[in-house]
């Protein structure tokens, strides 16, 4: 689960992690009033959406007087903000964060995340803050520190010193930053986060460090332990189809291709997407119907993927273990009763009750179904149908 910048900064402040003063605003008048209350002569007017790249998309502006606060707030609030993380459809800006200015002398990048390959928590830091970290990693890898932490040991001074060395900090600066990272690491672990990112982390003329931005992502499976975090959920920022799918126990993620996938099991789903890509087509979604799929959930999955107007072909790839292939077949028939299907469906069914499933589909009136003998054959059929 993701939260907004203003929510993340409130959590930071509650845990003694330095942030600049700021207030959330839901209207232009409230934005101006917040700037007045914060005081000073410079403010950042920031769009609040669950995506990065807001500045490049025009969603972050620096105002040097209250008239500019009003002008920028009126332009950003209600805009459809498109960034490299939102996709071409963008996100509607429904709230702003008005933040006090600071005398910035240097920007850094800092993140804490779970490294599944190494089975460790990893701190990633760079002297090149405020930029796309992937670009920095590609062009200047020597400017990035990657420090692994064994969760059984936790964050120690030597971890912090390794980060400070790459960032080029002096002794006093290192001491301040290491203290800040220690608090961030504790927060990350205590709140069951998947990722904590500050980009940029700034150093002021006074030599102090502040989180100028804050992005936190939490483990959905651990939210029952953190009701105060679960309350921060903003469902308006979530994809409606993904939210609806979750209500039916389906794991669905929309992508930008034209081949809809319906698969059981996350591993098989990823393999299916890989082979679709390898064949030259592009998957339109990740969809795992799970091991306990019923005809009802399969029908719902059909409804959801057919709402995507980019879809040209549906590829159903089921290996029947716990889930029975005949249930999938009945779900397909149930779905076609409620939703008109005018695009080809490639079906590969193997495993429990696969023969019964084939009989069900053969005896149906569906003329746009094509049977695949194996995964490779299915991908080839899909590619030929997409064109």
Swiss-Prot record:
Pathway participation: Carbohydrate metabolism; tricarboxylic acid cycle; succinate from succinyl-CoA (ligase route): step 1/1
Cofactor note: Binds 1 Mg(2+) ion per subunit.
One term of GO molecular function: magnesium ion binding
Enzyme class (EC, first level): ligase
Enzyme Commission (EC) number: 6.2.1.5
SUPFAM superfamilies the record matches: Glutathione synthetase ATP-binding domain-like, Succinyl-CoA synthetase domains
GO BP, one annotated term: succinyl-CoA metabolic process
InterPro entries hit by this protein: ATP-grasp_succ-CoA_synth-type, ATP_grasp_subdomain_1, Succ-CoA_synthase_bsu_CS, SUCC_ACL_C, Succ_CoA_ligase-like_bsu, Succinyl-CoA_synth-like
GO cellular component, one term: cytosol
Keywords: ATP-binding, Ligase, Magnesium, Metal-binding, Nucleotide-binding, Tricarboxylic acid cycle
Catalytic activity: succinate + ATP + CoA = succinyl-CoA + ADP + phosphate; GTP + succinate + CoA = succinyl-CoA + GDP + phosphate
Binding site for ATP: 46, 53-55, 99, 102, 107
Record-listed substrate binding positions: 264, 321-323
Cofactor(s) recorded in Swiss-Prot or TrEMBL: Mg(2+)
Pfam families reported in the protein's UniProt record: ATP-grasp_2, Ligase_CoA
Residues involved in Mg(2+) binding: 199, 213
Sequence similarity: Belongs to the succinate/malate CoA ligase beta subunit family.
Role, per record: Succinyl-CoA synthetase functions in the citric acid cycle (TCA), coupling the hydrolysis of succinyl-CoA to the synthesis of either ATP or GTP and thus represents the only step of substrate-level phosphorylation in the TCA. The beta subunit provides nucleotide specificity of the enzyme and binds the substrate succinate, while the binding sites for coenzyme A and phosphate are found in the alpha subunit.
Record NCBIfam families: PRK00696.1 (NF001913), sucCoAbeta (TIGR01016)
HAMAP family from the UniProt entry: Succ_CoA_beta
Quaternary structure note: Heterotetramer of two alpha and two beta subunits.
Name of the protein in question: Succinate--CoA ligase [ADP-forming] subunit beta
Species in which this protein is naturally found: Campylobacter jejuni subsp. jejuni serotype O:23/36 (strain 81-176)
Lineage of the species this protein comes from: Bacteria, Pseudomonadati, Campylobacterota, Epsilonproteobacteria, Campylobacterales
Protein encoded by which gene: sucC
């Amino acid at each position: 689960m993701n939260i907004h910048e203003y929510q993340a900064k409130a959590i930071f402040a509650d845990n003694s992690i330095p942030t600049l003063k700021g207030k959330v605003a839901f209207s232009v008048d409230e934005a101006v009033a917040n700037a007045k209350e914060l005081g000073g002569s410079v403010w950042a007017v920031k769009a609040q959406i669950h995506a990065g790249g807001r500045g490049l998309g025009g969603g972050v502006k620096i105002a040097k007087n209250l008239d500019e606060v009003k002008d920028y707030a009126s332009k950003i609030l209600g805009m459809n903000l498109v960034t490299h993380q939102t996709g071409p459809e963008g996100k509607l800006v429904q709230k702003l964060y008005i933040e006090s200015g600071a005398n910035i002398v240097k920007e850094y990048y800092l993140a804490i995340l779970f490294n599944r390959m190494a089975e460790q928590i990893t701190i990633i830091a760079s002297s090149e803050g405020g930029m796309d970290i992937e670009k920095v990693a590609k062009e200047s890898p020597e400017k990035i520190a990657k420090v692994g932490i064994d969760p059984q040991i936790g964050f120690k001074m030597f971890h912090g010193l390794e980060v400070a060395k790459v960032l080029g900090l002096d002794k006093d600066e290192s001491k301040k930053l290491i203290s800040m990272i220690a608090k961030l690491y504790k927060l990350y672990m205590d709140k069951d986060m998947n990722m904590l990112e500050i980009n940029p982390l700034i150093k002021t003329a006074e030599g102090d460090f502040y989180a100028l931005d804050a992005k936190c992502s939490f483990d959905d499976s651990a939210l029952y332990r953190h009701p105060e975090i679960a309350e921060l959920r903003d469902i308006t920022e979530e994809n409606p189809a993904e939210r609806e799918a979750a209500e039916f126990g389906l794991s669905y993620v929309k992508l930008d291709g034209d081949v809809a996938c319906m698969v059981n099991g996350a591993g098989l789903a990823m393999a299916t997407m890989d082979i679709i890509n390898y064949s030259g087509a592009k998957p339109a979604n990740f969809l795992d119907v799970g091991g306990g799929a019923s005809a009802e959930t399969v029908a719902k999955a059909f409804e959801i993927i057919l709402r995507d107007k980019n879809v040209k072909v549906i590829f159903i790839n089921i290996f029947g273990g716990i889930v029975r292939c005949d249930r999938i077949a009945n779900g397909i028939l149930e779905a076609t009763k409620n939703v008109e299907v005018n695009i080809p469906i490639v079906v590969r069914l193997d495993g429990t009750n696969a023969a019964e499933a084939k009989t069900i589909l053969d005896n149906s009136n569906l003329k746009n179904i094509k049977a695949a003998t194996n995964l490779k054959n299915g991908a080839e059929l899909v590619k030929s149908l997409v064109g």
